[in-house]
Amino acid sequence: RDNTVLNLNLAFNYGGRDEIVCAIREMIREGIQADEVNIDLVDHYLFTNGMPDPDLIIRTSGEMRISNFLIWQAAYSEWYFTPSYWPDFDREELHKALLDYSARERRFGKLSTCCTEET
């Protein structure tokens, strides 16, 4: 409702593990000490610096795996898997993904409220 910006990322020839290695190498080159490293600092050195972590990641082709994609940034993302291949992914498929996403309870790593209520 209050969202005014949409970020859409398309990644080609990208690997999340390689991105993390590049970030670590850059920190070492700049002389950053181990005790200075924290989540915010690592975020700064990633390719996605300055962008919010994704809320929703759509995986096409029917594969049920993350394929080394945004492995740092996707920690609390919601995933939607569709059998459609990327060239066939259209407005209707996007609508399905967004409807599915809108029905989810975003927990950001926390337990569901149904699991934390005392009985």
What are the residue ranges of the model-derived segments?
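Flexible, compositionally biased loop and terminal segments
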Residues: 1-119
